[in-house]
Amino acid sequence: NIVENALEQVRPIVAKSYRDYRNYKQDFVRMLDDVYKKSQAIMYVGDKENSNADSALVSTKRSLIFNQLNKELYQKFFLTTEEIQACRDGYIYIHDMSARRDTMNCCLFDVAHVLSGGFEMGNIWYNEPKTLDVAFDVIGDIVLSAASQQYGGFTVPSVDLILEPYAEKSYRRALAKYERLGVAADLAEKEALADVKKEFEQGFQGWEYKFNTVASSRGDYPFITVTAGTGTGQFARMASVAMLEVRRGGQGKTGHKKPVLFPKIVFLYDENLHGPGKPLEDVFEAGVACS
């Protein structure tokens, strides 16, 4: 290179700056070329690196192309030369490299606090749910929206305890309806409880459909987990058992039903609650049957 040699003889410092700038531009050309090649593969072949992302969807294709650019930028500006070489040689692997630049990884989301008193999301004010079925719908909206702002797992802890107060509201509403209709007290209570149980079953079924068919704005299906099993109240127990029974029954055509992927269910076992003769032994048995 004539210019580089001339600068080296006159001003070595300037020559070094010239080389660095030239290499910088060449690196960007290579980086964008790699992104373009990957984008062509995504558009016409697809990408199966992440089973949560269906590359047949247009929104997912866009997300995957953006992720490839993010990955290249992360390698360029956040990794050392030694780290990059170690990745290429297979000595280390950096998971979710495409998402590490601009957000957080994994979340234990406090849905109960968000619901309490209402909240704002997407410039719209959500009032606190007054019934169980509305609580299921609102929680589904919250989870998909919040999970889109991060990567990795998204966990909603103790859904049995979260849903318990809304089940109580639905129960009192149903009970009041039957009492207005002149139904006997014992029958009214029985029918109100049956209504709440049905709302639980439909709500958990709705989550299973929503979390496995509605992609997040990231273009993937968020890795959603829920925990349950420790609530000792009547409706908390009903929530845990209903969720496990819905999962056990599966989704799909009659005679061909199978369990869905999301949400993952984590049963919180406590020997003092779930052991033989303990108050939640029946909930534990439902968990065993589901597993």
What are the functions of these language-model segments?
Residues N1-L32:
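Non-catalytic terminal accessory/regulatory regions of metabolic enzymes
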Residues D20, Y24-S291:
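Conserved catalytic cores of very large enzyme subunits
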